[in-house]
Amino acid sequence: EQWLHYIVDEAVPKLRYLSKERNGWDDLPGVIAFGCSLGATHAVNLYLRRPDIFCGCLALSGIYTAHYGFGDYMDELVYMNSPVDYMRNFPEDHPYMELYRNQKAVICCGQGAWEQPDTTWMLKRIFEAKNIPVWVDLWGHDVKHDWDWWYKQTAYYMPYILG
């Protein structure tokens, strides 16, 4: 949990401070969780765990269950870093549900080399069941797990996230 506390308690406040100091903003308009590959996994986890801090999410080619790293092992720490698992059990009356429903999030994955879209689809089904409007998008079989595609996907989705 140290990584979460570092980002929430140190990195985001520093971003807010710098945005005010350098841009004259009284408050940072919003922090979007963004990442590719393992960064996408972290972006989704940060956004889902703290939508009060992160106003949106763009995640490209992530894996959203801890099963890939931990197999069938599960303790509280693993559970809290496995979005498929904790969102499956997320209570409908939790205050974060309203935040999820009023923010923009995109989760995208290709189907080409080195991509693993199965957990993306697991999250899609969970979001649909909970009426959380996340844009879950699967790109073609030619779209591989690599930077050239992530550049294209970022350019494609960022206007939606920022709009």
What name fits each language-model region?
Residues 1-163:
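Non-catalytic cap/lid and distal C-terminal segments of serine-dependent acyl enzymes
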